[in-house]
Design a protein with these regions (language model features):
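Conserved acidic segment of CheY-like receiver
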Residues: 3-22
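Acidic, metal-coordinating helix/loop segments flanking the phosphotransfer/catalytic sites
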Residues: 33-59, 123
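His-Asp phosphorelay/catalytic-motif detector in bacterial-type signaling
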Residues: 55-59, 84-89
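Active-site residues of response regulator receiver
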Residues: 62-65
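Alpha4 helix (beta4-alpha4-beta5 surface) of REC/receiver domains from two-component response regulators
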Residues: 71-75, 96-114, 118, 122
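Short amphipathic alpha-helix used as the core "switch/output" element in two-component signaling
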Residues: 71-86
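A short, hydrophobic beta-strand element within the central beta-sheet of small alpha/beta folds
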Residues: 87-99
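CheY-like receiver
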Residues: 122-145
């Protein structure tokens, strides 16, 4: 079970859609939603420097294209995995299903890719069933369509 999630997405409306989906799936958790990759980078840098893994979320969902940010979701995932030692389940949540982007995300260290839509609940439910394998690092990369 996921206790804490960080959602990095520039669309405030999707923050609400995601939160509603989590509620409908009876996911009791701490959900923090932020709008920029820069803000997420600063949080991970803080957690890394302080060595405080208690504040770090268990799972991070990152939008592919984050407007107003210095870098996109794939670059953020690469940075988290390589600069901060990861320690979280992390993947992309995007309306794109471009195979080249999906492959880039996988190479950057993304563990999953969820196709974003207003009807996100079935994909999140399927992801939640797979989550223990992601947490144990035994799940293969998967695209949830």
């Amino acid at each position: 079970m996921i206790d804490s999630i960080l959602l990095v997405d520039d669309e405030d409306l999707f923050h609400l859609v995601f939160e509603d989906a989590c509620s409908l799936l009876d996911m009791t958790l701490s959900l923090e939603a932020i709008s920029s990759s820069d803000e997420a980078d600063k949080l991970f840098e803080k957690w890394f420097k302080e060595g405080n893994s208690n504040e770090k979320p268990q799972c991070v969902f990152v939008d592919l294209n984050i407007l107003g940010s210095s870098f996109d979701g794939i670059e953020l995932i690469h940075k988290i995995n390589h600069d901060y030692g990861n320690g979280v389940v992390i993947g992309i949540i995007s309306s794109s299903d471009d195979n080249q982007e999906i492959e880039k995300a996988k190479e950057a260290g993304s563990q999953f890719w969820i196709i974003k839509s207003d009807e996100i609940e079935p994909r999140l439910e399927e992801f939640m069933m797979d989550y223990p394998k992601y947490e144990n690092k035994t799940a293969p990369f998967k695209v949830y369509r």
